[in-house]
């Protein structure tokens, strides 16, 4: 089952999309698992280098670790996580709040997380299929939120997991 906080964040994203005339994205158990796994990893694993951003993954789990840098050289590390961790054999795209191993002191909830993404043009574009993302049709959405970390995952493939 999808946790209440994850569901609240996914529903907030879909409500925001509806305000812009966009269809809701089906909420995915698989992508929610990826998102919740990643927020827990971000919260509990220290940054391995200053250049590693919130798309980074530690070596502390059953996944391929990576230091995700601003040049997107490690994009495949993000894209492959749904296939690594779930039955959803699809490319995943992530928006995040929070750095590895850092706690801001702000306890996020769905409205705060969504507001942060709305205030960032690059993240807002992913949610609303604008710019780089205008040709994508999101067919699955997952979310996770723990303390000062939040993730939302998007894929153009439907989740086969019931």
Annotate each predicted stretch with a short phrase:
Residues 1-162:
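Functional surface patches built around histidine and acidic residues
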